C-alpha cells in the first residue's frame, strides 16, 4: 500500500537529483540566468510606488469607500491637526493670546495642504445687531489693548456651547488650534506630494510634510512659555508612517538580519552558509516587488509583512538544504554527489512546503481589503521564487570549494562526524523519550488542547490604533492628554440627506439631526458634537439679542431660509463645513476619545438602535468619515484574516491528502499544524490579550510556517519507514536525518522574530513575540506530538520488520 506513494516521491526526488547535477555542471549558466531574472525583477520593481493612504485598503467599488468619496465631494477633507496648549495665566491671558494670534497666522501661511486654521484669535463669532440683524466677524479682528477688554470677550465666548470643549476648555486653562486640511489619507499619491517632482518618499508626502511644518513652527522661540500637545489625524498618521516605515522597520530588519547572520555563522561556520540563504531571500524579495511593479500595484501598508515572511521561508529552505548537504559532503566526500543526494531527499518536501505556503497565502486573496489581497499574491510569488533560488542559486554557492576525498582516513571521518554530535545525540534521546512515553504525550497534549479551546472561547477581537504606539512615542501621550481634557481626537460623521435641494432648511430635518445629536452625546466616549443645528440655534439666539430662550431651531422653513441668507450676507462661512452646496445634505460630526474599536463601534450601534426604535421620517442618514472608514477597515481585515486562516487550513489539508494520497495521513499531519495556533490563541484568551487586526495575521502565517516543518518530518518519516518497515527505527532515522535542520531553522526564526521586542510599535512587538512562540510550539508539536500520533495510529501501514522490544537504538 505504500508503493505508489513511495514511487511518486522517489520519482520527484530523481527529478530534483537531476536538477542538482545539471546546476552543478552548468553553474555559470545558472548564475547568469539568475542574475538576469534578478535584474528584470529590479527593473519591474522600479515602477512600484509607495502608497500608505487609506485608499490602498479599499477597492473603488466598495460601498463604504464610495460613501466616503461622496462625503468628500460634498464637504472636503475631515482630517485635522489638533493643537492643544497650556500656559501660565490660561487661554485668556493677553500675552498668550498674542502668541496664539501669531501662531495661527504662521500655520495658515506656512503649513502645506492647509485649508483653514481656527483658534480663539480668529474664530467666527456671531451676535445680534438690533433690531433685526446680526454681526458675524472674526473674534479678535480688533485685538484688545488690555486684559480687561479680553475678559469681556471671554465672557461672551464662554456662553456659547459651540466653542467650549473644542477651542477652549470649560475652566479656560487650555486652548486649542484646529488646523483643517485640504487633503486626506484617501487621496491618491499624485495629489499629496509637496514637490510634484520630489518622488513618493514619505518626507515629500502628506501628512508627513504638514506634520513636520507644524512641529517646526511650534518649536520656535517666540512661543516659549506655551506647552503644546499636538494630536489629531495629521500628527497620528504622520507619526505612524514615519516611525513604522522610516525608523522602526529599517532598524528591525537590520537587527533581524544581524541576528540571523550570526546564527548561520554559528551553525555552518562558512561563508556559503550565510551568503547563500540571504541571496535566496534577496532574490525572493526582488521577485515579489517585481510582481508588484508588473501588475501596477503600489507598495502599501501590508508590504511590511512581506520581508518577515520571505526571510522565514527562504532561511528555512536554505537551512534544510545546507544541513543535508553537510551530512552527505562528509559521507561522500564529493560536492556534486552530495548536492544530487541532498536534492533527492530535500527537494520534494521543499517543493511541497513552498506550494502549501503559497496556497495558504493565496487564500487571503479573497479578502475585501485590497492591500491584504495584494499581499497574498506577491508573497506567494516570493515563496515560489525562494524555492527556485534554493535549488539553483544556493546550489551554485555549494558547488564552489575544495572536494573532500571519499576515502579519507578514519580519523578525518570521525572528526567530521563529531560536528553536530551533541545535537544529534539530543535528538536521538528525544526519539527514545517519545517512544517510551507516547501515551503520556498524547494525554498531555489532549489536556492542553481542551484548556486552549476554553481559552479561545474567552478571546475578544478588538483593535486600538493609538496603542499601536509604545508609550515612548510622544503622540500617544499627547493624544491621551487631549482626549482627557478637550474634545476627542477620533471623528465619526453622519450625513443626513433630505432628498432635495434646500431640504435641510426644513425644521423637521433639523430636528431629526438634533435628535440623533442628543442621542450621540449620551455616549460616554463622545466628548463633542458639531452640526448645522448648533449654528442655526446660535443664529436664532443672536437674532434675539442673545436670549438663551431662543437657543433652538426656528419654527418654519421660511425663517430658517431667511436666517441663513442674512448669515451668509453678513460674511458667515462656518456653516459651509456642515452643508452641501445645494443644501440637500448636512453633517453631524462626533468627536470621540480614541480607544478600542469595539467601544467606538458601540457608538454606531447605539445610534442604530435609536434609529430602529425611532426611524427618521424627513431624511435618510449614513455613517461615514475617516473614523468610520477605519472601523470598517478593521472589521474587514479582522474577518478576512479569520476567513483566510480557515481557507488556508482547508487548502493545506487537501494538499497534504493529495501529496500522501491518503486522507488519514493528510488529516493526521494537520494536527501538529493547528496545534501551535490553538495553543497560542488559547494562552492569549486566558491572559486576557485581545486579537487585533495585527495579531490576527498570526494564524495564516503560523499555519504556513508550521506546515513546512511538518511536511519535512512527515515525508522523511514516510521515506524511512518505506526503507526500514519499522515505525520506531524510522523515527530514529528521521530525527537523525531531518531533525537537526528542523531545530536549527526554528531556533534561527525564533531568535529572528524576537528582535521585534525592540520595536517602538507595540503591535509589531507583540506580533514578533507571538510568532516566535508559535514557531517554538510548532517545533515541540512536530518533535513530540506528531511522532506519538504516528506510533499510535500507524498511518503508513503495517510494519514489515518486527520491532525490538527495547525502545533504545
Annotate each language-model stretch with its function.
Residues 3-50, 396, 404, 412-464, ...:
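Signature of alpha-helical transmembrane segments and their immediate interfacial
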Residues 69, 73, 98, 144-270, ...:
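Extracytoplasmic
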Residues 245-299, 366-370, 643-689, 758:
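Interfacial segments of transmembrane alpha-helices in multi-pass membrane proteins
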Residues 261-265, 281-282, 298-319, 362, ...:
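Hydrophobic transmembrane alpha-helices
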Residues 263, 351-394, 653-657, 679-690, ...:
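Hydrophobic, glycine/alanine-rich multi-pass transmembrane helices and their short helix-loop junctions
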Residues 309-330, 350, 357, 392-393, ...:
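Short helical (or helix-break) motifs at transmembrane helix termini and adjacent helical loops
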Residues 328-355, 721-743:
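Helix-loop junctions and hydrophobic alpha-helical segments within the transmembrane domains
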Residues 432-558:
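Juxtamembrane segments of multi-pass membrane proteins
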